[in-house]
Amino acid sequence: MKIALASPPYPASVDNALYQAEKLIQSAAPAGAEIICFPETYLPGYPGLGYDTGTTTQEMLESALTRVCKMAAANSIAVIMPMDWHEAGRILNVAQVVSAKGEWLGYQTKNQLDPTEDNKWTPGTDRNIFEVNGVKFGITICHEGFRYPESVRWAAMKGASIVFHPNCTGNNTAGKQLTEWGHQDNPYYEKAQLLRAMENTIYFAGVNYHFKYPDSASALIGPDGTCIAHQSYTEAGVLVAEINIDLASGSLAKRFKPALYNYG
């Protein structure tokens, strides 16, 4: 299976995000990608980065999701679209999953929030496994994938061949220009993603925005911890790479003995 990891610029608005999303989807589908993933809360854009993303209502978000479903169907490609979502008086940080036929398959919530996000979202409580064209996958969103490896181990133990990791690391105002993926002087993010793959013997796909000062690049990491491909630090775009589910054995995840660890 070929997958696509989108690295768009930070959106100016929901409409701008949808415009960019359609362009990247239209680029990924002809390259043979069967699923494309976007960065964390791409709709309307991760808050607190100095941009005014405006006020979004649930009606606006539902309309945006409908447009994403139409894009998926028009291009015959499944889509993982992270976004805000209003539910029962709460605002959730979710990743919506849409089939290549434009059918809504469900969403994964961000369950472990960064401490700085407690006033932005309500944490979710459920974890889910999704399946597209016979490939099972999980989703872990930003902080929880970096800091809580259990979120990835759970998916691997449930049979996921790959875990997608939409995230937001970096900014456009100040920072360090990265040049080499996984370099020892880079922020820890890429190294954490490498570990999530190899400690579970599955694929791990990090998906970040294109920033002037990124702290990580969108990348596909193999079950042995090898970075198979990554997006350029200096260019927006979409990365298309192939996975071989026969290599994603999940062997190390299957050896985990949860009974040895009592968190109560």
Walk through the language-model features, giving the residues of each.
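Cys-nucleophile CN-hydrolase/nitrilase-fold catalytic domain and related Cys-dependent amidase chemistry
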Residues: 14, 22-101, 173-198, 202
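Extreme N-terminal starter segment of soluble prokaryotic enzymes
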Residues: 1-4
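Active-site catalytic loop in hydrolytic enzyme cores
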Residues: 86-185, 191, 247-263
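Short beta->alpha transition motifs characteristic of CBS
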Residues: 44, 96, 107-114, 219, ...
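Short polar catalytic/cofactor-binding loops
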Residues: 7-13
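Short beta-strand scaffold segments in enzyme catalytic cores
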Residues: 81-83, 94-97, 128, 218-220, ...
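CN hydrolase (nitrilase-like) catalytic-core segments centered on the catalytic cysteine
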Residues: 60-80, 146-236
